[in-house]
Amino acid sequence: MAARCSTRWLLVVVGTPRLPAISGRGARPPREGVVGAWLSRKLSVPAFASSLTSCGPRALLTLRPGVSLTGTKHNPFICTASFHTSAPLAKEDYYQILGVPRNASQKEIKKAYYQLAKKYHPDTNKDDPKAKEKFSQLAEAYEVLSDEVKRKQYDAYGSAGFDPGASGSQHSYWKGGPTVDPEELFRKIFGEFSSSSFGDFQTVFDQPQEYFMELTFNQAAKGVNKEFTVNIMDTCERCNGKGNEPGTKVQHCHYCGGSGMETINTGPFVMRSTCRRCGGRGSIIISPCVVCRGAGQAKQKKRVMIPVPAGVEDGQTVRMPVGKREIFITFRVQKSPVFRRDGADIHSDLFISIAQALLGGTARAQGLYETINVTIPPGTQTDQKIRMGGKGIPRINSYGYGDHYIHIKIRVPKRLTSRQQSLILSYAEDETDVEGTVNGVTLTSSGGSTMDSSAGSKARREAGEDEEGFLSKLKKMFTS
């Protein structure tokens, strides 16, 4: 039980299901939240309040100014108050609706409302019937908590004794729902919609279009202008973006006087917002375009030239403007049979002969932009890397180029001529750092090695004992 009175109003918490009986006429049980009280005798607040303790507070009764509480000689009066029963008292907390703590700042409240309003906007949740209700609840909560006066009143009395449409100094019963159109509230705060048409505002909630583009390795590394087919919302070609059917006229909007803006009274505040009748155009379309239906924009299939920046990677997504819209393109880069990529660096293999590895020389390697002359130092080992600075991929978010690393691979022949085999056997005789054995070479007791007689005689017949072969020269070079 609670009672609060002032010179202007009296707020009494009435017990249900039955009001206290008064001699002459008794109060009837409330029907559908409406109470009619006919009082024909003296009424005092203590006597009336004492009868409420048995049932407990369940309803709100507001007695308006001019009611005599201690006694009156004038005719019986009628006090009729529309109110909700215990259900409104269980309304979800505004702070919980916005997901903010009770001590949240105005910046936090605005940020929470913005994020949730975008998430539950009816235009982005057309298949969810509860989205519109949730969107309205968010507007209702933000309308109260964004006003410091209303917020203090809500913190003190809660939704049961607060009317968001009233001013900070006036109290009345709870009406429920926001006093401003949720759509208008959203536009006013976050729409940036003072001079745009309603069709343009709708595009804010369109899902971004995503496309996949196939690229070769070289196209991704060096960049390319590639023609691409997209479906985008662009200016309607039939009405040229005007929205009305060609040959027809538009009507002046009398709702906003042609200004495109309307004034909304929200109690102690006056708010200027986009006209709900014409959507900010200042005019009404009588005969909408049959293609865009008055929006001024229509979905069109267009072939556009997409400038692919040099250095994009596989799976990378970029945002590109196309007409008045933006699209997202995810690149799928094919693997190269020559190059391997590591950021801005590329790697490739270069096969050289045994002679090139031993004696050194030059070789030609395929580069990303041109053929590269590679210098092979003597004694090059397999898998040794040779760095070619600045021959890699452009750095997409920086300056300069990556490097090209060439991995040396020594190509060993699978088949030898008799001459080549004899020369290799001659070279193997003088090798001392061999672990294991070599076919055709026999180890001696002193630790040296000699060719087998059959292999040696055959080699001498073909090569000639007095002829110095290629590998013999190599042997002298390494043993001298």
Swiss-Prot record:
Tyrosine phosphorylated. CXXCXGXG motif repeats lie at residues 236-243, 253-260, 275-282, 289-296. One of its GO terms (molecular function) is protein-containing complex binding. The modification N6-acetyllysine is found at residue 134. SMART domains: DnaJ. Widely expressed with highest levels in heart, liver, lung and skeletal muscles. Also expressed in keratinocytes; expression level and distribution is altered in basal cell carcinomas. One of its GO terms (cellular component) is mitochondrial matrix. Gene3D superfamilies: DnaJ domain, Heat shock protein DnaJ, cysteine-rich domain, Urease metallochaperone UreE, N-terminal domain. It is a peripheral membrane protein. Transmembrane segments: none annotated. Residues 443-471 are annotated as: Disordered. The keyword Transmembrane does not apply. The modification Omega-N-methylarginine is found at residues 58, 238, 293. InterPro entries: Apopto_cytoskel_mod, DnaJ, DnaJ_C, DnaJ_domain, DnaJ_domain_CS, HSP40/DnaJ_pept-bd, HSP_DnaJ_Cys-rich_dom, HSP_DnaJ_Cys-rich_dom_sf. Changing residue 121 to Q: Loss of modulation of apoptosis. Pfam families: DnaJ, DnaJ_C, DnaJ_CXXCXGXG. A zinc finger (CR-type) spans 223-301. The modification Phosphoserine is found at residue 398. Residues 93-158 form the J domain. GO terms for biological process: activation-induced cell death of T cells; cellular senescence; mitochondrial DNA replication; mitochondrion organization; negative regulation of apoptotic process; negative regulation of canonical NF-kappaB signal transduction; negative regulation of cell population proliferation; negative regulation of programmed cell death. Keywords: Acetylation, Apoptosis, Cell membrane, Chaperone, Cytoplasm, Membrane, Metal-binding, Methylation, Mitochondrion, Phosphoprotein, Postsynaptic cell membrane, Repeat, Synapse, Transit peptide, Zinc, Zinc-finger. HAMAP family: DnaJ (MF_01152). Interacts with JAK2, HSPA9B and IFN-gammaR2 chain. Interacts with Ras GTPase-activating protein 1 (RASA1). Isoform 2 interacts with MUSK (via the cytoplasmic domain). Modulation of apoptosis, i.e. proapoptotic activity of isoform 1 and antiapoptotic activity of isoform 2, is J domain-dependent. This is DnaJ homolog subfamily A member 3, mitochondrial. It comes from Homo sapiens (Human). The lineage of its organism: Eukaryota, Metazoa, Chordata, Craniata, Vertebrata.
